């Protein structure tokens, strides 16, 4: 389509004004063209081009073709770069092919009130995205476990998401702890440095020491438990289940170790056990949530199902202290899902 470097047969938009794909991009009189954040090999696409719309949104276009082939939805990279009108057209194409398909957007902030390029976006108003990557969830988890915010502030963050997001959008938000754009969670929870503190030659090789890794694993259990008991869809970034380390690119995108190279299965057991809690309590998937703080270091939230069954998740972030707390409860008895112990309610 663009073919600036002549790698493909035929004449691309960059090579000739007569190319049928010329109006699919934004060219200027001097031959320069618009591109994403100045990256020359990522030319900006003209959303109003009929050729672009047909190739992406038409009956045999990219969106519908791959849904027809078996995909169950699409994740749109950098949704902020797409106009509301174009997102609406993408949603129409998705629904025309597969009414129950998911349309998810990469949005780093609260998707219900995001302002990009000076405009309040309409992501979650029904005609565009079904939901978004839940970076606010990630920020809340890290902020609380690392001591950047107390339990009252973390509970407020949870309540803000609950109040701002439509129930359906919160239920299918992508709850991530790591991504290809952010440092890996195990490195963050172990107190990994700001990359600007490291020479570029050391960034991809940086690793936690043994003491820091032990601390990171303790926090990883809490983070993963929150991920598996929070409304939305848990998203495990490849290698996180094996404690793969890494700051930002390229450290967070390095090759997945082979089975023979894996020697530490603590984090795998953590993910497995936290996942078991989610599977054992179906209302963790579609139940209501209500968050509250028990003191500065203890965060809690209730999950309640349609039949009234409920569970309270309690997170003590303290490295040294146990806390005696009082929690609201319904019913006559309760059981500890993790230990299996039962107790009477007084």
Predicted feature locations:
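Surface beta-strand/loop "capping" patches
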Residues: 284-308
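Substrate-binding/active-site clefts of carbohydrate-active enzymes
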Residues: 1-69, 90-96, 113
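Short, well-ordered beta-strand segments enriched in hydrophobic/aromatic residues
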Residues: 309-317
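C-terminal beta-strand-rich structural cap/linker in extracellular carbohydrate-active enzymes
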Residues: 344-346
